[in-house]
Amino acid sequence: TFWGTEIPWVSISDMPISGYVTNTRESISKLALKSKKIDISPKGTLLMSFKLSIGKVAILDIPATHNEAIISIFPYANKENIIRDYLMIFLPLISTLGDSKDAIKGKTLNSTSISELLIPISNHEEMKRIISKVDLLFQKVSQLFE
């Protein structure tokens, strides 16, 4: 059967707001993995929803597969994950600028509109500064709700 207990399967509801996916409500079987030619995304992969709740992002903290409303993003890798973390900040902001289409259950982006998104990129030091500043602001916001 498709469903099982072996391989975590991420749906949009498993993605915390700008956080890490540490577990999933559902899993698929190894048979499903083979028969459907589904890939397992490694731990550390940036995920983004492009259907229904466009632009929701999270980072995998476990190897997992995901449903068809989510894409795995593998930016140029560096040890500090600067580009991945930078994209995690900007993708929710700019993904709504893509050419979305109305579908039965809501808006969707297609692969062309995703690939045509213009992402403001600067040098690594500037991106690190932006990431640090945004992280600090999120910490302050979290403290307001404690």
Please place each PLM-identified region on the residue numbering:
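DNA target-recognition patches
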Residues: 1-32
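Short, well-ordered loop/turn elements at secondary-structure boundaries
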Residues: 3-6, 40-44
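Generic short alpha-helical hydrophobic face used as a protein-protein interaction/packing hotspot
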Residues: 14, 91, 131-135
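Basic, amphipathic alpha-helical recognition segments used for DNA target recognition
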Residues: 15-26, 37-43, 59-120, 140
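A generic structural signal for residues embedded in beta-strands
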Residues: 48-49
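Short, charged beta-turn/beta-strand-edge "cap" motif at the junction between a beta-strand
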Residues: 53-56
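Amphipathic alpha-helical segments with low aromatic content
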Residues: 116, 123-146
